[in-house]
Amino acid sequence: MTASLPPEVQQVFNSFLTTEFTTVDSRGRPICWPLTPYYDQGDPCIDVTTALGYPKKAEDARANPKVSLLFSDPTGSGMDDAPQVLVQGTADVDAQDLEANRKRYTREALVKLPGSKDLLPPKPLQRLFSFYFTRLYIHVRPERTSSMRASKSCGSRVGSPPGQTYTRSGRTWM
């Protein structure tokens, strides 16, 4: 579905440094986590990660794959007038090759957050922090995507033009 979205929405997925990732826990309560999204234009999914040492996000997404991503804060994205984008989708937790996930995370994080390079421990010591660098990837396949522009005054949407909603053909998310 992402390839059929407007380029500006795809740019939000690629450029934003954080997204609010929401899962539903075993008691039916929503839990929201700020995570860094990883996306390449045209990919079928938007990916987020969690450290192997902090698996709750992945466990909740595995138990109830209906998740959402809210792209609301463009800070650091270089997009001054970015729309806010809500993605409701289906999660797939990738824990098949943890070593490949660790390498991918290290590579992608340095591209997305180049300033983090100075904060990384030296490579030989990174193994001591495997609980953090070893990653579970959560692939979110959008089922419904909505975008709207926030008003400049206090973030209020009062008086803002209606947003756009895109739904994968023949699918319901609820």
PLM regions with names:
Residues 60-67, 107, 111:
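Short, intrinsically disordered, mixed-charge
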Residues 41, 52, 73, 93-95, ...:
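Non-catalytic surface loops within mature trypsin-like serine protease
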Residues 14-16, 30, 133, 140:
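Short, surface-exposed loop/turn motifs at beta-strand boundaries within globular domains
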Residues 16-53, 59, 69-72, 83:
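Short beta-strand segments
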Residues 43-45, 66, 90, 144:
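Structural motif
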